[in-house]
Amino acid sequence: MDHPREKEADRPVRSSKVPQGRSGHSRPSSSSASSGVLMVGPNFRVGKKIGCGNFGELKLGKNLYTNEYVAIKLEPVKSRAPQLHLEYRFYKTLGSADGLPQVFYFGPCGKYNAMVLELLGPSLEDLFDLCDRTFSLKTVLMIAIQLISRMEYVHSKNLIYRDVKPENFLIGRQGNKKEHIIHIIDFGLAKEYIDPETKKHIPYREHKSLTGTARYMSINTHLGKEQSRRDDLEALGHMFMYFLRGSLPWQGLKADTLKERYQKIGDTKRNTPIEVLCENFPEEMATYLRYVRRLDFFEKPDYDYLRNLFTELFDRKGYAFDYSYDWVGRQIPTPVGTVHVDSGASAITRESHAHRDRPSQHQPLRNQVVSSTNGELNADDPLAAHSNAPITAQAEVEVVDEAKCCCFFKRKRKKNTPRHK
């Protein structure tokens, strides 16, 4: 998961006290038996590598008490830009809500900090590839309605996300009751926009380093302006158009240096009229982008207005909110094979969806986390492929345009030609 990173000094203040997870966390945090089996906490066995990113590595794990597979996120204790502890703290802040999977454990594991995560299904980027890199309007609207609510909930907890990209939104595992829900993952770049001490909005600043993924980030982020709630929503709008078009006009730009490339991306975004970007698609897509780009730095977005833009369009088109996404009925690769997504999967009524996708302000606090793994696992135990390869810490500040992720698909690079429905 490569993305531009802000300077460490600009990160929210980290607590020096390592938070404890669930039951049993006061016991030894890690162990290595004579057989060479690596353990995290008292009951999580570490297996093969299934992903990687700026934080370090993602490993397959198994809860030896319940026999359930999990994901284990490992970050070197001596990382140049540590984020795992901060991410864990943000998940405690977020608590329990729809589309926020669980964290089962956080603590030291030898030379690493470890967070044990819930396994989820494939990312929207994986599914986009599976669907020949274009989504129907119905699928995009079902995604958009959910993600506006996800972002509203995150913002309600005084956090901004700052890492919008398709790789960071995952469906649930097949066969799970949450398999049709779009989950938001990876809060390593999140930031408190309300100062926890003063309870005031962070000040407007300029000359900030880029944070996020250049393909989707807001125009103001390219200009070096401090991010706020408006920027998360603008980045979502760019992602929605990416799904509808198949690509964005600022993809594939060439330059001699990374700095020049990001400058070109930002310039192209500014110079591409919204009407051109959204040409041949419903006016609501352009209305959404115009609204979020006009928001003031301190302004609270009208999430209901944005949601209603898309729900009214959805109704006008005569769609049913049955979670029949474009990928339903296709074979979805997993770490151990393929899973057929049943087109007759349990449908949820529009009314229940509408109720569920409104963020709850009274959710009980519960440790949560996300997994950037994709797919599900069967009864075969792949943990024997455990690797002790060292983790290389990433640079403190990294700027990368291409939305990279660790997935179970072999990506095919395609020409960036817009696709229209």
Curated annotation (Swiss-Prot):
Positions with biased composition (Low complexity): 21-36
Keyword Transferase carried by entry: yes
Ranges where the Protein kinase domain occurs: 44-314
Keyword ATP-binding: yes
Catalyzed reaction equations: L-seryl-[protein] + ATP = O-phospho-L-seryl-[protein] + ADP + H(+); L-threonyl-[protein] + ATP = O-phospho-L-threonyl-[protein] + ADP + H(+)
Keywords per UniProt: ATP-binding, Cytoplasm, Kinase, Nucleotide-binding, Serine/threonine-protein kinase, Transferase, Wnt signaling pathway
GO aspect biological process, one term: endocytosis
Residues of the active site: D163
Enzyme Commission number(s): 2.7.11.1
Binding, ATP: I50, G51, C52, G53, N54, F55, G56, E57, L58, K73
GO molecular function, one term: protein serine kinase activity
Biased composition (Basic and acidic residues): 1-13
Enzyme class: transferase
InterPro entries with a match to the protein in the record: Casein_kinase-1_gamma_C (IPR022247), CK1_Ser-Thr_kinase (IPR050235), Kinase-like_dom_sf (IPR011009), Prot_kinase_dom (IPR000719), Protein_kinase_ATP_BS (IPR017441), Ser/Thr_kinase_AS (IPR008271)
Record's comment on post-translational modification: Autophosphorylated.
GO CC list: cytoplasm; nucleus; plasma membrane
Taxonomic superkingdom: Eukaryota
Pfam families registered for this protein in UniProt: CK1gamma_C, Pkinase
Record function comment: Casein kinases are operationally defined by their preferential utilization of acidic proteins such as caseins as substrates. It can phosphorylate a large number of proteins. Participates in Wnt signaling.
PANTHER family from the UniProt entry: CASEIN KINASE-RELATED
Family membership noted in the UniProt record: Belongs to the protein kinase superfamily. CK1 Ser/Thr protein kinase family. Casein kinase I subfamily.
Protein name: Casein kinase I isoform gamma-1
